[in-house]
């Protein structure tokens, strides 16, 4: 019995403990769980509502999308049709432009081909004509006939006047021209009293003084001061050269500095010119003027075809004495004997180049020699040597045209083919066959 009561008491204690401590906790847990379930049910209901709303929104969005897609498709179709029309119109315009451009290009190509054909035909015609002319003038008689025909044409030309003047005068202004003319006239009278040795010495001394004045620019400037009283200038030249030159040379220098010169260099040119006149006076007394002129022109042509020799003789960096030695060696090796007057004239010219090209200076010297006799120099180009009759006739015709004696300097150039080319000063009469062929070729279309 006591066992039963003890167990009952223990059970009662357990029940009490469960009711007192466990039941409240479990109750609270159950209540919290119920609240959680109720909240989840509420959330589920809200989610169901949102799902329904989303479904409705989706359905509406699909309908809106279909409507928008239909609208976009319609707009795209309309734009495509409009673009297609624009492209078609643009294609028509472009096709028309290309067609017109193609037509213009065809016309241009046709014109170019036509012009090229004409040009080639013209060049071929000129080439054939040149070949025919070359074959024709291969016969010396036919080539000589071309010269005769040109002389006939030249003979029919209207006369023209030409003044024979010292070439140096063309380089000077009026004051120097008057001074040089007066000096040369005075020297012509004064030279009659000088013998061969006197003229030779005079020429050499004048060249030495000219070289001195070329080096002493200040002295030259004082000697050409344009003052009315020439006494100071005469005294200066006397102090400068007295005892160094002979009396004739000193007299020439006194006369030269007493003149009025337009430029300082004109005085030096005048002194050099008088020295040349002294040597040419020697040639004239010996009856060798023609030989001197011919040798001077021949040496001028040698310089034209030997540019290296011209460069060596005209190199002012080399002392004048060295260039003169070279000149004399060249002249000593010449096939024929060179006239001593020519040697002296060329030597003096090389000494007094003063920056001028030697070939130009020698040609100028030859023209001075010709002008001394009152003659005109005619530079004549021919394809072959002229006969004596043709040369005589040419000289007579040119003398009649220009109203003065003419000296003919002949230059042979086979490239001229036929006819003659004549240059008198700045005037050129070109009647060569080569020039006519060149003129025909120049008239061809570009």
UniProtKB/Swiss-Prot annotation:
A GO term from the CC aspect: proton-transporting ATP synthase complex
Major localisation: membrane
One Pfam family from the record: OSCP
Molecular function GO labels: proton-transporting ATP synthase activity, rotational mechanism
InterPro entries: ATP_synth_B-like_membr_sf, ATP_synth_b/b'su_bac/chlpt, ATP_synth_F0_bsu_bac, ATP_synth_OSCP/delta_N_sf, ATPase_OSCP/dsu
Subunit organization: F-type ATPases have 2 components, F(1) - the catalytic core - and F(0) - the membrane proton channel. F(1) has five subunits: alpha(3), beta(3), gamma(1), delta(1), epsilon(1). F(0) has three main subunits: a(1), b(2) and c(10-14). The alpha and beta chains form an alternating ring which encloses part of the gamma chain. F(1) is attached to F(0) by a central stalk formed by the gamma and epsilon chains, while a peripheral stalk is formed by the delta and b chains.
PANTHER family referenced in this protein's UniProt entry, alphabetically: ATP SYNTHASE DELTA CHAIN
The name this protein goes by in its record: ATP synthase subunit b-delta
Species of the source: Mycobacterium tuberculosis (strain CDC 1551 / Oshkosh)
């Amino acid at each position: 019995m006591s066992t039963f009561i003890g167990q009952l008491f223990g059970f009662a204690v357990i029940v009490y403990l469960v009711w007192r401590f466990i039941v409240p906790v479990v109750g609270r847990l159950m209540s919290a769980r119920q609240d959680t379930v109720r909240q989840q049910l509420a959330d589920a209901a809200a989610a169901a509502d949102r799902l329904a709303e989303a479904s409705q929104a989706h359905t509406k969005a699909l309908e809106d999308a279909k409507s928008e897609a239909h609208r976009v498709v319609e707009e795209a179709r309309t734009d495509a049709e409009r673009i297609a029309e624009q492209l078609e119109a643009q294609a028509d315009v472009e096709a028309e432009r290309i067609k017109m451009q193609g037509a213009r290009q065809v016309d241009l190509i046709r014109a170019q081909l036509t012009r090229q054909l004409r040009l080639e035909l013209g060049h071929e015609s000129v080439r054939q004509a040149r070949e025919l002319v070359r074959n024709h003038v291969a016969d010396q008689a036919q080539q000589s006939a071309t010269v005769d025909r040109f002389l006939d044409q030249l003979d029919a030309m209207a006369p023209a006047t030409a003044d024979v003047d010292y070439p140096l005068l063309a380089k000077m202004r009026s004051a120097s021209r008057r001074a040089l003319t007066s000096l040369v006239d005075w020297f012509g009278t004064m030279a009659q009293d000088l013998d061969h040795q006197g003229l030779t010495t005079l020429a050499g001394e004048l060249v030495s003084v000219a070289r001195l004045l070329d080096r002493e620019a200040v002295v030259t400037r004082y000697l050409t001061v344009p003052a009315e009283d020439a006494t100071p200038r005469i005294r200066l030249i006397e102090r400068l050269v007295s005892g160094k030159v002979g009396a004739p040379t000193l007299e020439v220098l006194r006369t030269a500095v007493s003149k009025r010169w337009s430029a300082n260099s004109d005085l030096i040119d005048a002194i050099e010119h008088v020295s040349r006149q002294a040597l040419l006076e020697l040639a004239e007394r010996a009856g060798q003027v023609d030989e001197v002129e011919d040798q001077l022109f021949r040496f001028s042509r040698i310089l034209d075809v030997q540019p290296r020799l011209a460069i060596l003789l005209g190199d002012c960096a080399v002392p004048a004495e060295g260039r003169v030695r070279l000149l004399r060696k060249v002249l000593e090796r010449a096939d024929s004997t060179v006239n001593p007057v020519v040697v002296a004239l060329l030597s003096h010219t090389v000494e007094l180049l003063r920056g001028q090209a030697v070939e130009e200076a020698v040609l100028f010297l030859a023209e001075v020699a010709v002008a001394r006799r009152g003659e005109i120099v005619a530079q004549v180009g021919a394809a072959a040597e002229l006969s004596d009759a043709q040369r005589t006739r040419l000289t007579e015709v040119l003398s009649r045209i220009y109203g003065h004696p003419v000296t003919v300097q002949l230059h042979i150039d086979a490239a001229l083919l036929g006819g003659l080319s004549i240059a008198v000063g700045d005037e050129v009469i070109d009647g060569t066959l080569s020039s006519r062929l060149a003129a025909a070729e120049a008239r061809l279309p570009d």
